[in-house]
């Protein structure tokens, strides 16, 4: 016997205060869009179905649909067109009743685009600190990842500060820097001591105050095939 699912979905996932803690959109590629969720959040109804539908804004009749059981924790919709805008909707049904609707608008990437550069967001920068933020995805797979941010003074490479944080924290900040000074800032991702990704920016701290980062020059490298799918450019759930 299933419980009464006519109430809002929060009743079926009492361990979580918000749907934002359960579902996360995967970054669009040139031909796919995906959604992940905590697969243990639906006890007793793991075999019920979640539907993911993508409607291109330029061709509303050319709809793509994919299905997955709630217990699987993931659904991916393939066969999309590159460089196209889609309205994507996820619906979950239990015993014929719709208990969840999530929607978002995505633009697929053009062919050949390197999406790994969209994971991390530099800033804000103050007169004494540099921060880098990153988007969350697949908590069950990324809990062991460590992100390290290093700031090296460009004029004196021997002067360096570094801070680390677990991936789930979403940001790391290096403090104690000199004001109005150019630093070589490097963000690195590690798992079990092995480096999987690094990206470098030349960033000048402010004379005073704080603002979003101004990148002076850019360089970076990454191993996209070993980043465990950490390619989320946004986690946005619009509940209807």
Swiss-Prot record:
Domain Fibronectin type-III stretches: 1-109, 110-210
InterPro entries per UniProt? FN3_dom, FN3_sf
Q: Which residues form a coiled coil?
A: none
Name of the molecule in the record: 45 kDa antigen
**What is the taxonomic lineage of the source species?**
Eukaryota, Metazoa, Spiralia, Lophotrochozoa, Platyhelminthes
UniProt entry keywords in alphabetical sequence: Repeat
Q: Which organism is it from?
A: Taenia ovis
């Amino acid at each position: 016997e299933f419980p009464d699912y006519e109430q809002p979905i929060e009743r079926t996932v009492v361990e979580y205060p918000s749907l934002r803690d359960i579902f996360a959109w995967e970054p669009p590629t040139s031909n796919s869009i995906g959604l992940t969720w905590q697969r243990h959040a639906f006890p007793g109804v793991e075999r019920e179905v979640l539907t993911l539908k993508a409607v291109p804004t330029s061709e509303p009749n050319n709809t793509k649909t994919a299905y997955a059981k709630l217990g699987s924790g993931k659904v991916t919709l393939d066969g999309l067109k590159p460089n196209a805008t889609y309205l994507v909707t996820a619906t979950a049904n239990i015993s014929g009743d719709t208990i969840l609707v999530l929607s978002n608008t995505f633009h697929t990437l053009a062919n050949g685009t390197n999406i790994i550069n969209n994971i991390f967001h530099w800033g804000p920068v103050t007169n004494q600190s540099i921060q880098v933020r990153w988007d969350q995805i697949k908590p069950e797979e990324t809990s062991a990842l460590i992100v390290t941010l290093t700031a090296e003074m460009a004029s004196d490479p021997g002067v360096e500060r570094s801070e680390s944080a677990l991936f789930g924290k979403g940001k790391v900040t290096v403090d104690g820097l000199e004001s109005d000074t150019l630093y070589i800032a490097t963000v690195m991702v590690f798992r079990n001591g092995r480096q999987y990704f690094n990206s470098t920016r030349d960033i000048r701290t402010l004379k005073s105050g704080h603002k979003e980062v101004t990148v002076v020059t850019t360089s970076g490298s990454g191993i996209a095939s070993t980043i465990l799918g950490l390619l989320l450019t946004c986690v946005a759930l619009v509940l209807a």
